[in-house]
């Protein structure tokens, strides 16, 4: 190792290595690794800069700030503000120097090298402050939303949403809240284009308010029949088609070690059921369609009588049927619970919800409310929480009012459906992956999972790659998955589904309910393009999809009207799930709580890549947990494990040289490569072409049946095959077909 840092860069003559700097010239700014050489390179691109060097200096506040030193190329000294703006065009916001010092000459060591220790200290009184507070109403609102969505104490004017930990999905929540608070209609794309508090507030302050009016989400009088939300309606239809399928069951099993107060637990769950209406709602059908019937809390029976199990095997035999048992949501409350007693101080609490009542983002508020209620009940009192500002039924009414009808061409629903019809027009019906078995005519929900890991170093490189290209880790992962799917299928027009939380309004944060929607991400992968180009394309694709994510997936399917099949899911067969929802931690007094595998795995499509970020105590990337879920109807674990290996290999390759053509990425390695590599030695195989083999067979036994040419009752001899082949060759020659010509068969 030399310590020199280089990167691949495209040029007219092909890829070249570009020197970036030394690895010992790196600093951490607000948790981000900064290559100082990249800042220097940006500065020296200015015509009036002959030389530049950047250091990390400690400000009086204790923060590390970037200070650049510049030697002018002539007598005309460049303006510091102009240089700062120049640098902004080449590096992310966190790499813009806090100040720039203009030098008359460079301090050198006795051997003629730059003496970094002799560079003058900057005047910290004029250094750009690390934190600038908001002043206007728009700035205050944007800063508050950034802090709220990202779980921070505060956000300053110069803080970048994505540098603070934002991502594609949290960006949609932030924009929705800013729009609601300020009465504007900003899009997710604008947050990517103006990611700092100051920049986005400036756009909000000048945004057109004439088209921004949306009804506020508030508690309001309900009609006699409350309709389902659009997401619930899809769940209801799926459930009525097959009430026995566990595909949309959400099982949660927790091992509680310690003295469990059963009565307090029973009362706590009663409190939670009363607080969250979806947990006590049934959805009967009628001639006018299904509707919500919210039951009184005392009508919901929770049987928490402990059932004794002898060992782990007996525990498993209880959990699996509990997790996979059917719900008929038209008459059954979409929740069941059981307590399994392993010993005096060891229990497993199993909770199963139907997806019509809860999604992944519901787990955190559900866990918090159970904690509060159980703690209160162990002290002999009810939980003292404030009433919910709105309930799920309020959301269902608000959603339908906001989206409007697809029969109204001016409605939001119609506008978004038009977008999807244009975007998905002509998309291939099916992505054919290499499988271990033929696809059955009727797909089942049987699934399994292959977990794998992405190391901390690679995680950090991926984060840096995303930041350098004004994208997010989700977008980089999506692009890498597209490369993998393109290689596996041989296709260039690919579709991947991804869930979106659907919780833009702050009133929905603490609610248990079904808000999630699925959008289709259509990507075109050109082998000659670089990964950098693909990330830019994916960025546009994803931003467009997230900006039109309110129309339910089933309505998109109806509008696009693809060829339907019971053998596969419509529009996409691969799902990408980026789990960046709030972690649901459950801590109960006097108990150690551990998650238990409920033992039921389902496959909603052929392949599902799930990714989750891990960070260390300082917020630095600490690796990613990953898993490929797959349909066992068509795939084996060994095959999917190979997919995982190839995916990690792609991530390594694109972080090492993002400008390399993606068609040049080597996705096969190790044992796979050995299987494909000819073994040196052994029996020699003569290099004889197929026409030569046919000619030899014609001479040796012209009237023998050509085994490769049998169609029904018709069989050709080698002589007949040779004659037919010659006739076809003459026809092609007469048509002007020559070597390397492409001919449709």
Regions found by a protein language model. Name each.
Residues 50-53, 57-66, 78, 91-114, ...:
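AMP-binding/adenylate-forming catalytic domain of the ANL superfamily
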Residues 88-95, 136, 150, 185, ...:
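A short N-terminal helical cap/helix-turn-helix that marks the beginning
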């Amino acid at each position: 190792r030399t310590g020199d840092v280089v990167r691949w860069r495209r040029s007219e003559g092909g890829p070249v290595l570009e020197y970036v700097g030394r690895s010992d010239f790196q600093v951490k700014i607000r948790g981000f690794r900064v290559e100082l050489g990249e800042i220097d390179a940006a500065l020296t691109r200015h015509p009036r800069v002959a030389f530049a060097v950047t250091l990390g200096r400690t400000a009086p506040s204790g923060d590390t700030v970037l200070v650049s030193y510049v030697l002018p190329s002539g007598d005309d000294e460049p303006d510091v503000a102009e240089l700062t703006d120049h640098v902004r065009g080449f590096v992310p916001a966190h790499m813009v120097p806090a100040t720039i010092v203009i030098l008359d000459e460079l301090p050198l060591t006795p051997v003629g090298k730059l003496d970094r220790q002799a560079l003058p200290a900057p005047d910290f009184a004029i250094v750009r402050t690390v934190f600038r507070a908001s002043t206007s109403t728009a700035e205050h609102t944007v800063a508050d939303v950034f802090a709220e969505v990202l779980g921070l104490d505060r956000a300053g004017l110069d803080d970048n949403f994505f540098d603070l930990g934002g991502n594609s999905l949290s960006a949609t929540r932030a924009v929705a809240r800013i729009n609601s608070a300020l009465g504007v209609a900003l899009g997710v794309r604008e947050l990517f284009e103006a990611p700092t508090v100051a920049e986005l507030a400036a756009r909000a302050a000048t945004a057109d308010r004439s088209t921004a009016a949306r009804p506020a989400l508030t508690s309001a009088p309900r009609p006699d029949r409350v309709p389902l939300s659009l997401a619930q309606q899809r769940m209801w239809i799926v459930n009525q088609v097959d009430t026995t399928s566990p595909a949309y069951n959400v099982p949660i099993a927790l091992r509680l070690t310690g003295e469990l107060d059963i009565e307090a637990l029973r009362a706590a769950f009663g409190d939670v059921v009363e607080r969250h209406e979806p947990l006590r709602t049934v959805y009967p059908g009628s001639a006018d369609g299904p509707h919500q019937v919210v039951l009184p809390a005392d009508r919901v029976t929770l049987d928490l009588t402990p059932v004794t199990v002898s060992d782990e095997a007996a525990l498993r035999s209880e959990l699996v049927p509990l997790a996979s048992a059917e719900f008929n949501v038209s008459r059954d409350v979409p929740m069941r619970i059981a307590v399994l007693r392993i010993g005096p101080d060891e229990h497993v609490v199993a909770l199963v919800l139907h997806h019509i009542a809860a999604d992944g983002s519901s787990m955190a508020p559900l866990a918090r409310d159970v904690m509060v209620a159980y703690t209160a009940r162990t002290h002999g009192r009810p939980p003292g929480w404030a009433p919910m500002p709105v309930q799920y039924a309020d959301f269902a009414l608000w959603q339908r009012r906001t989206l409007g009808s697809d029969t109204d061409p001016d409605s939001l629903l119609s506008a978004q459906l038009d977008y999807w019809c244009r975007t998905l027009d002509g998309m291939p019906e099916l992505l054919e992956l290499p499988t271990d078995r033929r696809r059955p005519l009727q797909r089942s929900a049987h699934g399994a999972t292959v977990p794998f890991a992405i190391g901390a170093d690679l995680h950090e490189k991926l984060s840096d790659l995303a930041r350098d290209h004004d994208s997010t880790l989700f977008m980089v992962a999506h692009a890498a998955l597209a490369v993998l799917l393109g290689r596996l299928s041989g296709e260039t027009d690919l579709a991947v589904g991804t869930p979106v939380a659907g919780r833009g309004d702050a009133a929905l944060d603490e609610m248990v309910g079904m808000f999630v929607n699925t959008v289709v991400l259509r990507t075109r992968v050109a082998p000659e393009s670089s990964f950098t180009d693909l990330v830019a394309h994916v960025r546009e694709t994803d931003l467009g999809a997230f900006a039109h994510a309110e129309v339910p997936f089933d309505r998109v399917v109806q509008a696009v009207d693809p060829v339907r099949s019971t053998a596969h899911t419509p529009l996409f067969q691969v799902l990408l799930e980026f789990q960046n929802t709030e972690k649901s931690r459950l801590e109960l007094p006097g108990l150690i709580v551990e998650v238990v595998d409920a033992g039921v795995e389902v496959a909603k499509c052929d392949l599902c890549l799930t990714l989750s970020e891990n960070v260390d105590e300082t917020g630095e990337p600490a690796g990613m947990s990953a898993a490929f879920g797959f349909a066992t109807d068509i795939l084996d674990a060994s095959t999917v494990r190979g997919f995982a290996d190839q995916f990690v290999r792609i991530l390594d390759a694109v972080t090492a040289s993002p400008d390399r053509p993606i068609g040049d990425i080597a996705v096969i390695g190790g044992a796979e490569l050995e299987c494909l590599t000819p073994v040196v030695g052994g029996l020699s195989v003569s290099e004889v072409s197929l026409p030569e083999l046919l000619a030899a067979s014609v001479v040796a036994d012209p009237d023998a049946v050509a085994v490769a040419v049998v169609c029904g009752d018709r069989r050709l001899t080698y002589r007949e095959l040779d004659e037919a082949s010659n006739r076809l060759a003459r026809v092609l020659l007469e048509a002007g077909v020559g070597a390397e010509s492409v001919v449709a068969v």
